[in-house]
Curated annotation (Swiss-Prot):
Domain of life from the UniProt record: Bacteria
InterPro entries the UniProt entry points to: Glyco_trans_1, GS/SS, Starch_synth_cat_dom
Record-given protein name: Glycogen synthase
Family named by the database record: Belongs to the glycosyltransferase 1 family. Bacterial/plant glycogen synthase subfamily.
Lineage: Bacteria, Bacillati, Bacillota, Bacilli, Bacillales
Pfam families: Glyco_transf_5, Glycos_transf_1
Record field: catalytic activity: [(1->4)-alpha-D-glucosyl](n) + ADP-alpha-D-glucose = [(1->4)-alpha-D-glucosyl](n+1) + ADP + H(+)
């Protein structure tokens, strides 16, 4: 079986968020299952020179973008057994940032068209094209409407994964003819029209053979008005073609037994060494090195989506508890200012680093006792799984992937691997923090919790098997349709 991942970013080449981690890890796991999984992404200016040196040009062609004829170079690179194709066009991709440009609609209209135009040139005929988020949303739509009548494309199926429904790729109506070679027939509610705009995300939801999202709970949530971002009706209509498959983490990169960023490596059998990381973390943030004071951590984008309004609301009440807090992140100015001010107001209790620093993030995952993640919504979330892998117990709100990966501790049955609350309410969160702190002071309970957390499987292996089954059923369904239809 051959699968092409069409993505706008992919680790380790270009990354702005969790999508890059998925695109970097999942194809590797699929190859271990015998699938010829390859990845196609733009050749961004920001890709490190050491990667660019390893690329070799395998094709050149002209791609139509409305009335324009744009150059397209295809460069190939092999890394960890996976073949990567980079779409080269300096006009569109020689920019300092991946996204946020005035012509993102044109840039990704070009990329979607290039994905399909390039395949015959590189002589790769995938059984499935797996697209991710709005940037590649027009690939399934263009394939269905403009390419499937051609023999080369006739058997190709499409899968579209929603990583975050909030970002939809909305552009003015004129983009249809000007960039997509589509006429006014397609500006209707059953095609691309979305509240007066053209929606790349909707194009994928309408035309893909299968839609997946990144956790079973998020799959259910997005079919409701509260989480559905005005697409819940369409998603309910397509519920038979909708799957929720939980993301994994790269358990080789996030491995407390061999993590080069840690002060002290440790395993489930040597959990006492975790304390050395806690002391190092306290030292790094100028906090007193107290072993018996619980240290709560947050590694987060500082946005409202991450539930930081709850934290700001009850922060002073949190500080009345015997605890320390460490925060690493960047984002909205108001949250950056708030946490910086709180670090000054509570010296010895609060440590804050504004920005992102990979080695420090690993040290936090290893050194903290508890990890706070009170998200408003969370399609999957990776941080809670990383925390569990390092034996750091999560406190989460029951939404999306947080609900699927963290089971609240039950003192009667002794089951669970963390603590959770249901309502998006600051005092519900505060109650749950206090509950977690009470069990921290019961060593026998805490030992059980940390051992259970570290023994869990958070890898991509389980998820890759589910994707493989989904691809196989999709191909089988199509063969059945051809025979009996």
């Amino acid at each position: 079986m051959k699968v092409l991942f069409a993505v706008s970013e992919c680790a380790p080449f270009a990354k702005s968020g969790g999508l890059a981690d998925v695109a970097g890890a999942l194809p590797k796991e699929l190859r271990r299952l015998g699938i010829d999984a390859r990845v196609m992404l733009p050749k961004y200016e920001t890709i490190a020179p050491e990667w660019k040196k390893k690329m070799k040009k395998v094709a050149e062609l002209i791609v139509p973008v409305g009335w324009r004829r744009q150059y397209c170079g295809v460069e190939e690179l092999r890394h960890d057994g996976v073949i990567y194709y980079f779409i080269d066009n300096e006009y569109y991709f020689k920019r300092p940032q991946l996204y946020g440009h005035y012509d993102d609609g044109e840039r990704f209209a070009y990329f979607c068209r290039a994905v399909l135009e390039v395949l015959p040139e590189i002589q790769f005929q995938p059984d499935v094209i797996h697209c991710h988020d709005w940037h590649t949303g027009m690939v399934p739509f263009l394939l269905r409407e403009q390419y499937r009548h051609e023999l080369f494309y006739v058997d190709m199926r499409t899968v579209f994964t929603i990583h975050n429904l909030q970002f939809q790729g909305l552009f003015p109506r004129g983009i249809l003819e000007d960039l997509l070679n589509l006429d006014g027939r397609y500006f209707t509610v059953d095609h691309l029209e979305f509240y007066g705009c053209v929606s790349f995300m909707k194009g994928a939801l309408v035309a893909s053979d299968l839609i997946t999202t990144v956790s079973p709970t998020y799959k259910e949530e997005i079919q409701t008005a509260y989480y559905g971002e005005r697409l819940d009706g369409l998603l309910r209509a397509r519920r038979d073609d909708l799957l929720g498959i939980l993301n994994g983490i790269d358990d080789e990169f996030y491995n407390p037994e061999a993590d080069p960023f840690l002060t002290a490596t440790y395993s489930v059998h040597t959990r006492e060494r975790k304390q050395l990381n806690k002391r190092a973390l306290q030292r790094q943030f100028g906090l007193p090195e107290w072993d018996d004071v619980p240290l709560i951590a947050m590694v987060t984008r500082m946005t409202a989506q991450k539930g930081l309004d709850l934290v700001t609301c009850v922060f002073h009440e949190m500080m009345s508890e015997d605890m320390q807090l460490v925060v690493l992140g960047t984002g909205d100015w108001r949250f950056e200012q708030f946490f910086s001010q709180m670090a000054a107001a509570y010296p010895g209790k609060v440590g804050v680093y504004i920005g992102f620093h990979e080695p420090l993030a690993h040290q936090i995952y290893a050194g903290a006792d508890l990890f706070l993640m009170p998200s408003l919504f969370e399609p999957c979330g990776l941080s809670q799984m990383i925390a569990l892998r390092y034996g750091t117990i999560p406190i989460v709100r029951e939404t999306g992937g947080l609900n699927d990966t963290v089971q609240s501790y039950n003192e009667i049955t002794k089951e669970g691997n963390g603590f959770s609350f249901t309502n998006f309410n600051a005092h519900d969160m505060l109650y749950t923090i206090r509950r977690a702190l009470s069990f921290y002071r019961q060593p026998s309970v805490w030992e059980q919790l940390t051992e259970r957390a570290m023994r869990g499987d958070y890898s991509w292996r389980r998820s890759a098997n589910q994707y493989k089954q989904a691809y196989e059923q999709l191909i089988k369904k199509e063969e059945h349709t051809l025979v009996h239809g």
